[in-house]
Amino acid sequence: MNSSIGKFFVAACLLLGGLLYFTWMHFLDDFYRQQIPAEVEVGAMLYADSGIRGGCGSAIFALGPRSKAQLVLSGKRALAGARLESVDERGPGISKDWKETPYIYRDKEFRAESYWSTLSCSWISRTRYDTIMGALDKPGSFFRQYKEGVTLVIPSADLVVYLFF
């Protein structure tokens, strides 16, 4: 009898843990999607992680096929109206416009201290890290900086990356 109660308890704990995990992942998916302008069509969330205290992190989505086609056809013009009302756009070096890569590091800005360094807060795979950092060095990707985050759209890799700090 005690054995069946123990098995039931373990099964109930596993079920509850699974439900909590999927609820948390759904919350993160929804929260991070709100940080991407609606004009940038995103598919499935491929990755999300933040530092131990949540001070920095990243979310990576698949780029939707319509957005990719528009970006390939029109370039940065496809993002002309892409705005977020919920983010703070004030501060030094922050522009309300989307920019095309390559990313030009500002005077005295070290790569390790740039917007892109928040990738190191996440347990991102080396290949995905190289894809994102490589996209910053060549033309064809688009980014928009906010006071506490940045969105990077990489059509060549079918990725949309949101970094926050």
Give the positions of each predicted feature.
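Functional cores of ribonucleases/endoribonucleases
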Residues: 80-157
